[in-house]
């Protein structure tokens, strides 16, 4: 998959930091763990060895995934974005039509998405429904919990805190 994907400059630095840590710290540590487990004898019945090999496979897979993401990243400086329409990087305040509660989301890339911090992936159902909308628009979002309707009450672009 060669498609570019958006990421903030801070998000890209975080991605690079994770990649560097995996390559230079975790990879070395797991090699040492495997060597130590080998010293315990018969590898066919060595649970420590098997666990270390599984962890190594996970780490190598994550390294490949992050390298691919880094190669495809389209770094976007949110502080230079503006406008009334919702796009990547927007901080969007909505009012739930049913409860009249305000909720704020930030539209980010897949690597930076974290619903506990109200950061939604640009590929998520809510972000897909919001893209291109502006203040005063109503959006219908279909989620696993059902359909929700919101009114867009504020759109702004500001730097993200990591």
Swiss-Prot record:
PROSITE patterns: GREAB_1, GREAB_2
One Pfam family in the UniProt entry: GreA_GreB
Superkingdom to which the source organism belongs: Bacteria
Gene3D superfamilies to which the protein is assigned, alphabetical: Transcription elongation factor, GreA/GreB, C-terminal domain, Transcription elongation factor, GreA/GreB, N-terminal domain
Entry keyword Nucleus: no
Transmembrane residue ranges: none
Keywords: Coiled coil, DNA-binding, Transcription, Transcription regulation
BP terms from Gene Ontology: DNA-templated transcription elongation; regulation of DNA-templated transcription elongation
Alphabetized GO MF terms: DNA binding; RNA polymerase binding
SUPFAM superfamilies, per the entry: FKBP-like (SSF54534), GreA transcript cleavage protein, N-terminal domain (SSF46557)
UniProt feature coiled coil, ranges: 45-75
Cited NCBIfam families: greA, PRK00226.1-2, PRK00226.1-4, PRK00226.1-5
Family annotation (HAMAP family): GreA_GreB
Function text: Necessary for efficient RNA polymerase transcription elongation past template-encoded arresting sites. The arresting sites in DNA have the property of trapping a certain fraction of elongating RNA polymerases that pass through, resulting in locked ternary complexes. Cleavage of the nascent transcript by cleavage factors such as GreA or GreB allows the resumption of elongation from the new 3'terminus. GreA releases sequences of 2 to 3 nucleotides.
Similarity comment: family membership: Belongs to the GreA/GreB family.
The protein's name: Transcription elongation factor GreA
UniProt source species: Rickettsia canadensis (strain McKiel)
Lineage: Bacteria, Pseudomonadati, Pseudomonadota, Alphaproteobacteria, Rickettsiales
């Amino acid at each position: 998959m060669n498609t570019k994907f958006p990421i903030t400059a801070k998000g890209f630095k975080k991605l690079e930091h994770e990649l560097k840590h995996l390559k230079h710290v975790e990879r070395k540590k797991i090699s040492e763990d495997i060597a130590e487990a080998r010293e315990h004898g018969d590898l066919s019945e060595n649970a420590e060895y098997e666990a270390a090999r599984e962890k190594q496979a996970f780490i190598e897979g994550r390294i490949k995934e992050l390298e691919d993401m880094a190669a495809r990243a389209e770094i976007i400086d949110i502080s230079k974005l503006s406008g009334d329409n919702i796009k990547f990087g927007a901080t969007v305040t909505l009012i739930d039509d049913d409860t009249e509660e305000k909720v704020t989301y930030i539209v980010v890339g897949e690597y930076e998405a974290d619903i506990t911090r109200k950061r939604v992936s640009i590929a998520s159902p809510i972000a897909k429904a919001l893209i291109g909308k502006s203040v005063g628009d109503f959006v219908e979002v279909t989620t696993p919990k059902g359909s929700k309707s919101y009114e867009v009450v504020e759109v702004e672009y500001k730097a993200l805190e990591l």
